[in-house]
Amino acid sequence: VGCSFLVSQELTWNQEVVTFKSANPFSFEEIITNLDNEPVQDVSGILTLPEDFDPNIKYPLIIGVAGSLNWGPHHLKYLKMFQEMGFATFQLQSFDSRDVQSTVGTQTEVTTAMVILDSYRALETLSGHPNIDTNHAGITGWSLGGGVSLYSAWLPLINAINGGKFMFAAHLPIYPPCMAYPYPKENMQFSVAPIHILIGELDNWVPAAACTELIDKMYVSELPINIDITIYKDSHHSFDRVSEVTVNEEGYTLGDCRFPMNEEGSLWLSEYWHIPINKPLRQKLALLTCAGRGPSMGGNKEAREASFKFSAEFFSKYLKK
């Protein structure tokens, strides 16, 4: 626990900045095959305890992970709800810690791999906190953070990071990119902790179809799987924002992108073309084969309310003792 150099909001009495050591692996492959050689990166986040917290109690934890546009008001509203329910929350500051504010249109400065590592390093660090019960810890995130919440359940990554010593008890990915799928099916090795995806029917930034296809592949593998999905009707990317639907000209539309991933976390261009997508330039070239530009994003009142309600019920069910 320490002081941070970058905090995007003023702290209240029940908050503290927690700083820990992480790294900057570009890809899952770099975590699995080369983590010990990655240069150290200082990362911080904001730990918030419930306002009525008792210093003699250990609280269940929810780690929140932002999307490509960094933290927004609707994200913080979820965390506030969780705090009012008696959870401690950790607002991971992966972007600010690397002096990045947005990765829209590039997706290379702060990657899913980096933030998954950050999440587990945070979990390990918080295991030493006297008021945190990391045996009852969940993770949720939006867009890029949804990808973190999803693929942080992939066992080869967990084993490479900490040998399975620290794991999440529940994963709630909100409109995640589901375009990477472990291949062949023997690599579909996920935690048996519950995973539930929330996504919009009309999402063209990260399409729901990729997630339903991934889930189908998981169950076909006949390996232990505990995953489900809710698709909200008439809802775009960022359906839980309080905003009109607009087009983001810089963002990718990932409708047709699907990339197999081997046991070392290396993405290939396809099951037939084993061309690795393991560097920023190769990632950009791969996206040229399947992605467009100009996804839509914006709120849907019914989906937003349903998402908040589901999130509260999901974490209460799986994290409360």
Where are the language model's segments positioned?
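N-terminal cap/lid segment of alpha/beta-hydrolase-fold proteins
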Residues: Q9-I57
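Serine-hydrolase catalytic machinery in alpha/beta-hydrolase-like enzymes
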Residues: I32-V43, I57-G128, T289-S296
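Short beta-to-alpha linker loops that shape the active-site pocket of alpha/beta-hydrolase fold enzymes
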Residues: E51, Q93-V100, P177, S235
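Catalytic His-Asp charge-relay segment
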Residues: V192-D203, I227-T230
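C-terminal catalytic histidine-bearing segment of alpha/beta-hydrolase fold enzymes
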Residues: I225-K321
